[in-house]
Structure formats: C-alpha cells, structure tokens
C-alpha cells in the first residue's frame, strides 16, 4: 500500500519533490511527499496531474488498447500527456507536455508564464469564461447566458442548444486547440488523441472544429485515421 499525489506544475519524480506549482510562490522545492509519508507511515509518491491522467487513461480508459497516445487536458491550465510504446514519455528532465505554453496569438494576453498569447490564455476554462464575459459586455446576445451566469458548463450547455455566441466561441477554441495538436501529431503520430476537461461537454461542436483544423494543418497520413475521443476519467 502506498499514497500517490498528483499536482500541476513542475515535478521531479526522481527526488519526489514539487519544484513549481501554478499560482503558488515556492521559493524552494516542496517536500510534500515526505511530510505525508511521515504523517501516515506509508510510502508516498508525487506525480504530475496531466501525465498521471494520461497514464491512468492508458491503463483503465480509452487508450488501453493503444501503443501510443496523446492526451490534452484543459482545466485551469492546459497540458499534455504522451504515451509511447506503452510507456509514459517524461524526458530527461522529467517535465514535458507543456503544450499550453505554445504561442497561438502573438498579440494576445499575457500568460502567467511571462509569454504572450499562449494556448492557455485562449482555451483554459477561465480564458473561455472571460472571453464570453467580454462578448456579452460588448452586446452579443444569448438566450442561455448572462453576465451573472456564464461559467464553462453553462457555455457548453448553451453551445449544445445551438446558441450562436457560445457555439462561435467553442469553435474558436477548437480551432486553436487543433493548430497546436497538429504540431504534436506531426511530431509524435499518436495512435489516438484524447481530450479531457469540462469543455468536452460541448464535444460535438468542439471536436468538429478540432478535426477540421487537424485535417488542414497536420500531415494527412498521420491524422486521417486517428481517433479523437473524450477522456473517460476527466473528472475523477
């Protein structure tokens, strides 16, 4: 028996230390695993949340039948987990998959990483909610959304009901995701692509936009028969 803890940010799985966590100011690496191990008298291990999700999906979810897969997780941030030949790809420095910090808009908003126009500033839950707020303030009309009620789940539900402003926003998000995924597909040629997060509640609109962009930006031979599916473990 052991304890496993997953966190966002930068994790050194060799030393079991947390090096960086978004929105937290860590002046030195955080030895959380050791504190938990001492408290419960059990071996404790630290892992990255998105990469751990990709591995869990490979063991128990929609990619358990795949040699290679690419998982994109969208929540407060945006990250990727890559499985190659049944093994999680972690790289020499053990921190890979920061797909949310690929620039998609050179004139866009400042990202928490310090760069401008990262994918995360466009497609994270908060980015989508903030963009919808701006659209509503600018006079765009929605039967299902208001300035008081436009969280990510409400936006997805509105899109599913063919609300014009919600659908247009989800399509824009899908296009930006598709552009970045196309780069990843050209590099890794995954057997299957998995999308995880609340935004998959609008997967009919979202996936159509992603697929269109993938087909126009990625190598046809790499993307032609590559399934695009929603995670089965998104909120677990």
Regions found by a protein language model. Give the residues of each.
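Residues that form or immediately flank small-molecule/cofactor binding pockets and catalytic motifs
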Residues: 23, 49-51, 93, 107, ...
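Glycine-rich phosphate-binding loop and adjoining helix at the ATP-binding site
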Residues: 1-68, 205-216
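Short secondary-structure boundary segments
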Residues: 7, 48, 74-76, 125-126, ...
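Structural motif
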Residues: 61-64, 94, 185, 221
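Glycine-rich phosphate-binding loop of actin/hexokinase-like ATP-binding domains
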Residues: 64-123
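ATP-binding/phosphotransfer module of carbohydrate and carboxylate kinases, centering on a glycine-rich
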Residues: 1, 15, 38-42, 106-107, ...
């Amino acid at each position: 028996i052991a304890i496993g803890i997953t966190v966002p940010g930068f994790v050194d799985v060799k030393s079991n230390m947390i090096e960086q966590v978004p929105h937290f100011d860590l002046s030195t690496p955080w030895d959380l695993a050791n504190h938990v191990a001492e408290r419960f008298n059990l071996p404790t291990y630290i892992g990255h949340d998105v990469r751990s999700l990709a591995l869990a999906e490979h063991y128990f979810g929609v990619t358990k039948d795949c040699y290679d897969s690419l998982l994109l997780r969208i929540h407060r941030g945006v990250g990727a987990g890559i499985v190659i030949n049944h093994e999680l790809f972690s790289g020499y420095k053990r921190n890979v998959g920061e797909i949310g910090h690929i620039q998609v808009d050179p004139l866009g908003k400042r990202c928490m990483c310090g760069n401008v126009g990262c994918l995360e500033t466009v497609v994270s839950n908060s980015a989508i909610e903030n963009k919808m707020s701006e659209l509503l303030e600018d006079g765009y009309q929605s039967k299902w959304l208001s300035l008081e009620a436009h969280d990510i789940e409400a936006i997805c539900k509105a899109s599913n009901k063919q609300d014009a402003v919600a659908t247009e926003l989800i399509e824009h998000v899908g296009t930006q995701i598709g552009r970045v995924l196309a780069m990843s597909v050209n590099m890794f040629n995954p057997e299957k692509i998995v999308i995880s997060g609340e935004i998959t509640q609008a997967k009919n609109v979202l996936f159509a936009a992603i697929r269109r962009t993938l087909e126009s930006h990625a190598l046809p031979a790499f993307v032609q028969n590559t399934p695009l599916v929603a995670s089965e473990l998104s909120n677990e």
